[in-house]
């Protein structure tokens, strides 16, 4: 256990009967960092959260928190708090009683509990709400209460189990901002589970993508999007157009279309598979024959169009700014691929 890593899973495997849901997983979370687990349904991300919490015991491997082996400890012995999707508030208690319940169970003086409850409510912008009840507040406010209930205990580790999935889009945006703000303010080491990619990107220092119980890639949101390690990652982290390509010293050639070689293409290989994000392809009325394409589908998305084009026997997906172009099906254009949105895939599809 290194000093900078506050939570570590070492060679952790979890089986349910003959089904291996976590396969020899290695995970390190530095002190004060927020790491998000992301992946398709059934990939094992919630099981990892439950293993860290002590709600499940690993079939093999060790779990460390703050340098201590907690593999065999219960959740009560791990100094951990969880924020659940369902909020898990007591309807027969006031909000103040809900938030202060953990302190009450620890035997803290009533006066101290009242003071800390007031402070916690202020933190989540619910000052003066201590005497209200769960059925008197909105879903977004209930999630703030659940967050305050966790923060008041000042845990070593904070776990989030899809906490925003029951909220509408606008509330999700404001709540993820509040969660990130408070997590950074208190420097709490946190593990977050979600199925929402934009949510994962917004709250995380690092994102860990899982599939079939294994880690596919871990990195900053920018790294995962711009430098995916495999075809699975390229597609999972957003739309991607995948092509075979030839690399020369100063250019990349895709179906006879040559463009400048990106500086980060450092491989010595000549034949590679490249990915191009839809926003890195633009359309114009001028170009070479190798760039000529025909629009086959257009979907208006508000600020942008999602456009499908036929090019060199391939079907490409583009995202076009709606203020710059109004494409129609059947129109002919010349496409341009911009190097900033290109990446080399180093592995075949791992999905």
UniProtKB/Swiss-Prot annotation:
SMART domains: AAA. It is a peripheral membrane protein. It comes from the Bacteria. Residues 7-237 form the ABC transporter domain. Gene3D superfamilies: 2.40.50.100, P-loop containing nucleotide triphosphate hydrolases. It catalyses: Fe(3+)(out) + ATP + H2O = Fe(3+)(in) + ADP + phosphate + H(+). Its EC number is 7.2.2.7. PROSITE patterns: ABC_TRANSPORTER_1, ABC_TRANSPORTER_2, FBPC. Pfam families: ABC_tran (PF00005), TOBE_2 (PF08402). Its main location: membrane. Signal peptide: none annotated. It is found in: Cell inner membrane. GO terms for molecular function: ABC-type ferric iron transporter activity; ATP binding; ATP hydrolysis activity. Keywords: ATP-binding, Cell inner membrane, Cell membrane, Ion transport, Iron, Iron transport, Membrane, Nucleotide-binding, Translocase, Transport. ATP binds at residues 39-46. The keyword Iron applies. The complex is composed of two ATP-binding proteins (FbpC), two transmembrane proteins (FbpB) and a solute-binding protein (FbpA). NCBIfam families: PRK11432.1 (NF008513). Part of the ABC transporter complex FbpABC involved in Fe(3+) ions import. Responsible for energy coupling to the transport system. Belongs to the ABC transporter superfamily. Fe(3+) ion importer (TC 3.A.1.10) family. This is Fe(3+) ions import ATP-binding protein FbpC. The lineage of its organism: Bacteria, Pseudomonadati, Pseudomonadota, Gammaproteobacteria, Enterobacterales.
């Amino acid at each position: 256990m290194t000093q900078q890593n506050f939570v570590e899973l070492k060679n952790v495997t979890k089986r349910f009967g003959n089904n291996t849901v976590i396969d020899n997983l290695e995970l390190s979370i530095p002190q004060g960092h927020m790491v998000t687990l992301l992946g398709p349904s059934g990939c094992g991300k919630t099981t990892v959260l439950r293993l860290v919490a002590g709600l499940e015991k690993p079939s093999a491997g060790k779990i460390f928190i703050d340098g201590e082996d907690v593999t065999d400890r219960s959740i009560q012995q791990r100094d951990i708090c969880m924020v659940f999707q369902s909020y898990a508030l007591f309807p027969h208690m006031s909000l103040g009683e809900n938030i202060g319940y953990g302190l009450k169970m620890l035997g803290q003086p009533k006066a101290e509990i009242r003071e800390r409850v007031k402070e916690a409510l202020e933190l989540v912008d619910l000052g003066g709400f201590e005497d209200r009840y769960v059925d008197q507040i909105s879903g977004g406010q209930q999630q703030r209460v659940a967050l305050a209930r966790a923060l008041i205990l000042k845990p070593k580790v904070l776990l989030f189990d899809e906490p925003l999935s029951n909220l509408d889009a606008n509330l999700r945006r404001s709540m993820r901002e509040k969660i990130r703000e408070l997590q950074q303010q208190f420097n709490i080491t946190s593990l977050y589970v979600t199925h929402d990619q934009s949510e994962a990107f917004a709250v995380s220092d690092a994102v860990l993508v899982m599939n079939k119980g294994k880690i596919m890639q871990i990195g900053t949101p920018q790294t995962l999007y711009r430098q995916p390690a495999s075809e699975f990652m390229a597609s999972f982290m957003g739309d991607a157009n995948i092509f075979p390509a030839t690399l020369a010293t100063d250019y990349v050639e895709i179906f006879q279309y040559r463009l400048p070689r990106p500086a980060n293409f450092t491989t010595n290989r000549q034949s590679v598979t490249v990915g191009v994000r839809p926003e890195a392809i633009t359309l114009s009325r001028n170009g070479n024959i190798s760039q000529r394409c025909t629009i086959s589908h257009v979907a208006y998305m508000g600020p942008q169009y999602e456009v499908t084009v036929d090019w060199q026997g391939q079907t490409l997906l583009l995202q076009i700014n709606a203020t710059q172009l109004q494409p129609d099906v059947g129109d002919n254009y010349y496409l341009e691929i911009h190097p900033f949105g290109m990446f080399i895939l180093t592995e075949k599809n791992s999905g």
